Amino acid sequence: MHHQKQQQQQKQQGEAPCRHLQWRLSGVVLCVLVVASLVSTAASSPLDPHHLAKRSFFDIQCKGVYDKSIFARLDRICEDCYNLFREPQLHSLCRKDCFTSDYFKGCIDVLLLQDDMDKIQSWIKQIHGAEPGV
């Protein structure tokens, strides 16, 4: 009987470090998953600075002259609109058809940029390649 108790105690003492190690590994795995999730979320953000590449210019059907600074200014309007409403699709809908969509017009209105319309229209004309109709 005494021998069985000793074996049980030894077994329990051996399991304690294993359980502790399992908890630590579980914590490490959880941390890695959380960090990976945050990184993937940040990478898929519509406000990713790499989305201003020339490829993006063509992706939204711009057929005019690519000017990175003008493109960035127009895109900033869509970013501000997205930040205001936090609707996941708003940023891409605002940029649709080279900044000539009704969503872009709506963003101009809610951001109170009507006074800048002449300047904005000239920017759109340059990168769109035609009269914007905004």
UniProtKB/Swiss-Prot annotation:
Any single biological process term in GO: circadian rhythm
Alphabetized, the UniProt keywords read: Cleavage on pair of basic residues, Disulfide bond, Hormone, Secreted, Signal
- Keyword Disulfide bond assigned to the entry: answer is yes
Q: Annotated Gene Ontology MF terms?
A: neuropeptide hormone activity
Q: Which domain of life is it from?
A: Eukaryota
- Annotated localization: Secreted
Gene3D superfamilies membership:
Crustacean CHH/MIH/GIH neurohormone
One Pfam short name: Crust_neurohorm
- What cystine pairs are annotated? 62-98, 78-94, 81-107
Could you tell me which SUPFAM superfamilies the record lists for this protein? Crustacean CHH/MIH/GIH neurohormone
Q: Under the cellular component aspect of Gene Ontology, which terms does the record hold?
A: extracellular region
Q: Which InterPro entries match?
A: Crust_neurhormone_CS (IPR018251), Crust_neurohorm (IPR031098), Crust_neurohorm_sf (IPR035957), Hyperglycemic (IPR001166), Hyperglycemic1 (IPR000346)
What family is this?
A: Belongs to the arthropod CHH/MIH/GIH/VIH hormone family.
Q: What protein name is recorded for this chain?
A: Ion transport peptide-like
Name the species this protein comes from: Schistocerca gregaria
